[in-house]
Amino acid sequence: MTIWVDADACPVVVREILFRAARRTGEPLVLVANQSIATPSVPNISMLQVPQGYDAADDEIARRVVAGDLVITQDIPLAKEVIDKDALALSPRGELFTRANIVARLNMRDFLETMRSSGVHTGGPSALSQSDNQAFAKQLDKWLAKR
């Protein structure tokens, strides 16, 4: 099983948590981004650079992910594709996307996108907090424990 990271927008603190976990467990960890991101010199950690372009990293992850893999992403449509392939999707805030919650998340995303395109300022997400980091690490450890 592989941990895939939608790394273009992944917070540094989350990447560091992932690096520590990959070192500890030996699980394959692949960061996918359209820019080069430094990774530790560890055999099971790699960086896959994709061409510049809208959703290029998302498309590459969706193409490569298989059942049982874990994908770290904030991108709701990518999370839906991952779930449809029987893999797991986890946000950097520690929210596990599931078949039970992904449709509601997609609907909310689409609604907010419609609001923004009509000129309504919806604001963005709050800064990542220590409790978000802990929630992420806890969910990651749960997945790793099942290996």
UniProtKB/Swiss-Prot annotation:
Belongs to the UPF0178 family. This is UPF0178 protein TERTU_3490. It comes from Teredinibacter turnerae (strain ATCC 39867 / T7901). The lineage of its organism: Bacteria, Pseudomonadati, Pseudomonadota, Gammaproteobacteria, Cellvibrionales.
